[in-house]
Curated annotation (Swiss-Prot):
This is RNA-silencing factor ers1. Disruption phenotype: Leads to sensitivity to thiabendazole and microtubule depolymerizing drugs. The gene is ers1. Its main location: cytoplasm. One of its GO terms (cellular component) is spindle pole body. It is found in: Cytoplasm; Cytoplasm, Cytoskeleton, Microtubule organizing center, Spindle pole body. Involved in RNAi-dependent heterochromatin formation and centromeric silencing. Required for the conversion of centromeric pre-small interfering RNA transcripts into small interfering RNAs, histone H3 'Lys9' methylation, and the recruitment of the RITS complex to centromeric sequences. Keywords: Cytoplasm, Cytoskeleton, RNA-mediated gene silencing. GO terms for molecular function: chromatin-protein adaptor activity. One of its GO terms (biological process) is regulatory ncRNA-mediated heterochromatin formation. It comes from the Eukaryota.
Amino acid sequence: MGKVSANNQSGFFKFYIDTALLLNAEFISSFTNCINSEYNGKVKISYSSSSQQFKVIVYEEHKREAFSLFEEIVQKLKRESTVYKKPRLDIHPFGQLHYDFTTLLNFQRYLDLGYGIEDVKIKENEDIVKSKVGKKPTSSDFYIPCLIKPKIITPFEWEGNFKQVIYSPTVYNGSFKRLFYLPDNNDLLKEFAHATNTKYKASLKDNKIVVLANNDQDINAMLEKMKHIENLVSQKVYEYPEETLVYAGKIAPCQLKFLKLKFENEILYTAMHTTSIFKSVFNILGSFYTMRLLRNKHDGDSYELVPVFAKNPSKTPPCNDNFKIFSDDIKLIGCKIFAGVSLNFSSPKPAHRFYELNKTSSNLSIPVLQKPSNFHSSSTELSDNSIHQGRRAVDPVVNQNNPSNFEEMIMNKLNKLPTIDKQILGTSSLTHFQDKTTAIEHSINKSNSKQPPRFKFQLPPRPTSNTLPLEPEEELVTRYSVSSDGNTVDEAITKQSQTFQLVNSNEFNEVNANDVHKSLRQNCAKLDFDDSKSKNLLSVECLELDKGSDCSTPKSGSLTPSIDMKFLRLQDEKMDDLGDNYYTILMSSNPVSSYGVGSLYLFQPKIVCSEKYINHEEIDNMNLKSLHRWLSRSLHVLQSFSGEIELNLEFGVILYPNISSDVSACSHGFMNIYKDLNLPRSYFADCITKSVSNIDSLLNTPVKILFGRTEYTYPLIEHEVLDSKNYFVFKGSLLFTDDKRNKTEDSTVFFSMICSSKLDQFAFYKDSKQSSTCTINFPLALWDSRLRIETKVPLNDAILTEFSKSIRFRNVNKDLLLVFGNMEDRVIIHSVTRINENSVPFNKNLLPHSLEFILKCSKVKSYDISPSSINSKEAFVCLDRSKESKPIESCFSLSIQSVYMQSQFKYNNSIRAGETAPWKLANKQFIGGAITENVSDLYTAAIIMVNQLGGIHPTI
């Protein structure tokens, strides 16, 4: 915004420049000194921090060249500020206040039309307006307008008695016109006054507002709204306490977290649905639980887990699609073994090489062994669908009771196969090869060899990781069958494919309520109520339904709730079954066990639910876009950390708070950053979805970034798989003995053990609770951001090595089991999960200085741990259930990694070893000096200043 006024009586011309820039005191001082020195005697420039304007004074003797001097100064300011930092595109959360610098040069347009300093004429068809109301402008007194004209508040007369309070901004250092006057000519003060039945008098000169009302209540309401907006614009945290609730279901892996936002309405809660809500101990088909929130003035807030039974559900939840990144259309994973084809491993682009081979795969013939008639058809892969491609089975005519004949037959079959390159044998993805230099190492070495432009990075050599490499080879799993005499007999040698198909079967059975209740009572009679799990379930209470609903509170010794509910959905407007007590805010319908449907519901009082949040599809869309923006921003922030770090996200469902209309309008402030992304109208950008299709959409949705006035579109990731892994994760506790000073002390250490899918490589980590939380200020928007960093500490102990040797595969009753020693005296296993992980690179166009970040897309399956009936010292998990049982549900996770997180960030040797860049807003070397480089404009500047974006970041 530029304003020029000339006054011959005062002897000089005055120009005012509203820069719309985010500048610090150092730059302002340097720029003003430079201009005053260069134009000494002609121009004097000063800066007002209150109005955030440059005032340029041109002396009388140089009035003829006043406009040319002003143009030169504006161009210098534009050029210098661009080098220091890009123009701030958004200085107000309610709308775009970015003024084009060409507007400031409109004076030259009037000069080109023949108007001089002494003979300026006012015409109705021109954009020149009067500077003073009721006074005809003279040749020496004129006003040049800009894009947006501020409103002028005229005083008014109040009739009758009234109370008044004088308000002026206290937190915000600037004029209140920037707070309450929007660029679309909307006046927030007028809207607030209408909503609170008040009136006001505004004085732009004194920067004060006089609030008038008939009572104190209306005045306080008006003041609260104005202070609220002032806090938002000044980026003050407005009461965002964060709380972590108790675990629901199985305690160890499940966590519920919510953000409490205090506004005009009552608080709403954010809940995350996780697959860790385990099955019922009653093993009843079709059973699931409902979680509700209890409000107690004395005890606070608490959750209760209530068993609920579905009867004739009206709708079946839609099945989720596969990830496109793992589908066959893109041809990323599932490389076949070729015969008679040699690979050139010297090629710098392994992915391109495998793509070429994939085109010729259809012309190659591979001998396939016949499958025995008594071989079960269910797959042992992670995929929910049975995939038999690449399996090797035996001839049905072979007598499998004779191990020697069976082994001889297998060897004969294998000898008939063509000769296969050893380096080709065992590959499971198109970009993975067993060489000393893998594809991922190649990309890391390439990244380390690059020097960031015009910025001094000092990165030490890549540290040697204690993590054992987990080769994603296609494994040969020996299946066993146990005869009646206890002898194990080889049944078949099967090869397990690494094809990653993310199929989530959302099916559930319609059961009769009476049959369920009858079965429930029968199973309750068999329960051991001394068991801790039974006690947890017996402590729950039923929902307080209407009088017409049948609900009995469970009592000690018998749990017989008689709850008859319909399967409610978010879009259901009528909640007849719940009555007037509760309103269903969140409903999810993903199965959590092989015995039925598991759903996590959140019930809220009906009075606090907004009608606009009933449509869950809109909420899902906002969640997806929010996560999309969060991921793209996180890439820049992560490079400042040192150590072995992983930032993880697990997908759930999050609701947005029921915010008021004035706060909702704030979301339009950062619309100009992503024009086509309707960002969620919320203060936190955290949120995620359980839907596989939404994750697929996330990975394939382009990121739109605004560079100055030009918008660029980049895909979030590159469709190239750098690495693929399939491994198990055991989590447990170890009784650790430490001998110091002849004193033996026993302590329990919680650990994680990563085991390759072939059970031949292991890595042990101590579950360190040391985690750091980094908060980053973000002045351009209203959300907070928090990055939670957790480190891994290697753990070496002989007892864990001994335990790892006890892990093996076994086939019992057509079910593939993973058996391990139950060493309760030293090692106790709490959970077992299987992870299929693919690593894909982010688009380098989104990264500063071509840093190579990797996105890891994983499918995680959790299993039950059951004691072995054959050997009391063993336990097992069932990896491949028979067709009669439904597969255990999988969850999907994303993690971000970079080689720069394993090195030290430095800037001109000013940061010592073991330190990272200070988290300060004015630190220009922060995030690799991205804001000092002309590379990413506002986008990069925004990324380095986000304040507390975290929320739910559970690790696997």
